[in-house]
Amino acid sequence: ESGAAIEWFLEDQSDGMTDRLEETVATSLFRIVQEAINNAIRHALAGEIRVRLRDKGGRLLVEVMDDGIGMDRQAQRIGHGIDNMRTRARLISASFAIRKNTDGSGTCVTIHLPPEMYEPIGG
């Protein structure tokens, strides 16, 4: 480990959607994000990690982006906790994707939850 500082940012534009998740769903989502951050630190040599939570048409969209070395397709298929992230996402009926950031650098892990995962407001 290099001991280099990592800048990290949390952008919550979800309008409180995370507060309405069922506890098991929230825990699974937390674990996926935790694994994505760990991968960025351990394998991607990232200097910056950004977690973004957004309300996208009534569905929670979570993105974990880093500015690291990126990940080739082979690495996506084997190890790095990716199977665990995929499985956790499947268990909460979320879509899961790994791709390069839109600017071509680093990696972006995307989790998109379906609308039925939220408890009603005031419920």
Regions found by a protein language model. Give the residues of each.
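Coiled-coil dimerization/phosphotransfer module
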Residues: E1-G123
